[in-house]
Design a protein with these regions (language model features):
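ATP-dependent small-molecule kinase phosphotransfer cores
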Residues: 40-100
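Conserved phosphate-donor/acceptor-positioning beta-strand/loop module used by diverse small-molecule
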Residues: 114-135, 143-155
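Glycine-rich phosphate-binding P-loop
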Residues: 7-20
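Short beta-strand-centered segment that lines the nucleotide-binding/catalytic pocket of NTP-utilizing
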Residues: 29-41
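Pre-Walker A (Motif I) flank of P-loop NTPase domains
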Residues: 1-10, 99
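Short, amphipathic alpha-helical "lid/cap" segments that border enzyme active or binding sites
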Residues: 89, 189-197
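Small-molecule kinase domains that catalyze NTP-dependent phosphoryl transfer to phosphate-bearing small molecules
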Residues: 60-65, 142-189
C-alpha cells in the first residue's frame, strides 16, 4: 500500500509549503492545485468556479437565467457542487493509488480514510499568519492592510470549515480527526518538514 500524507491547514499557516517540502524530503508526489485543474477537465467547468466551490465560497459565478425560480437555481448549484465533490473524490483516490504522495486540502483525509493516510493539520496564531501572507506578497494580497488581511484569513478559514464539515460530517481542525497537529508559530517550515520526514 502506498504511503499517503494529507495536510489540512489554516490559511497562512504554511501548510502548503510544509506539504511541498515534505514531498521533496521523502521523494513523494505532491498534489495541490493540480487537483483543481483535473476536476475542471473532468466536469467541464472552469477552474475559477471549481476553486470557488472547493473554498466553500458562495455560488455566484454561474449566471441565473431571468425568470428561473430561486428553487431551481439552488438545485442547479447544489448539483454542480456535488458533481465537483464526486470528481474530486475520484481524482484523489486515483492519485493516491498511483504512488506515495502528499495531498494538500480537498478533504483528502476523509476521502482516503480507508487507505489510512497520515493526517496532518497545520495551524498558527493569527499574527504569524498575517505576517506570512504579507511576506509572500502575492498579487491578490499585496495591497491589503493588516486589518484587511486578517479579515480575509478568517473568512477563508470559515469557508474551508463550512465546506469540510458539510461533506465529511467531521469538524475541520478538530484534533481528534488528525494524527498530527502542528503549530507553526515561531518555527521555520523547512525545519518542521525535516523533523516530520523522519517518521517515514
Amino acid at each position: 500500500m502506498n504511503k499517503i500524507i494529507t495536510i489540512g491547514r489554516e490559511f497562512g499557516s504554511g501548510g502548503r509549503e510544509l506539504g511541498r517540502r515534505l514531498a521533496e524530503e521523502l521523494g513523494f508526489e505532491y498534489y495541490d492545485k493540480e487537483i483543481i485543474t483535473a476536476i475542471a477537465e473532468k466536469t467541464s467547468m472552469s477552474q475559477e468556479y471549481v476553486q470557488e466551490v472547493l473554498e466553500g465560497k458562495p455560488h455566484h459565478l454561474y449566471p441565473i437565467t431571468i425568470g428561473q425560480s430561486m428553487f431551481i437555481a439552488d438545485n442547479f448549484y447544489i448539483q454542480q457542487e456535488q458533481s465537483i465533490y464526486l470528481a474530486q473524490s475520484e481524482i484523489i483516490r486515483e492519485l493516491a493509488q498511483k504512488s506515495n504522495c502528499v495531498i494538500v486540502g480537498r478533504c483528502a483525509d476523509f476521502i482516503l480514510q480507508d487507505l489510512k493516510p497520515f493526517r496532518i493539520f497545520v495551524y498558527a496564531d493569527i499574527e504569524s499568519r498575517i505576517a506570512r501572507c504579507i511576506e509572500r506578497n502575492s498579487d491578490a494580497e499585496k495591497h491589503l492592510t493588516e486589518k484587511e488581511m486578517k479579515k480575509q484569513i478568517l473568512s477563508i478559514d470559515k469557508n474551508r470549515a463550512k465546506y469540510y464539515d458539510y461533506y465529511t460530517g467531521n469538524k475541520w481542525g478538530d484534533k481528534n480527526n488528525y494524527d498530527l497537529c502542528i503549530n507553526t508559530t515561531g518555527f521555520v517550515i523547512k525545519d518542521i518538514a525535516s523533523v516530520i520526514s523522519k517518521i517515514f
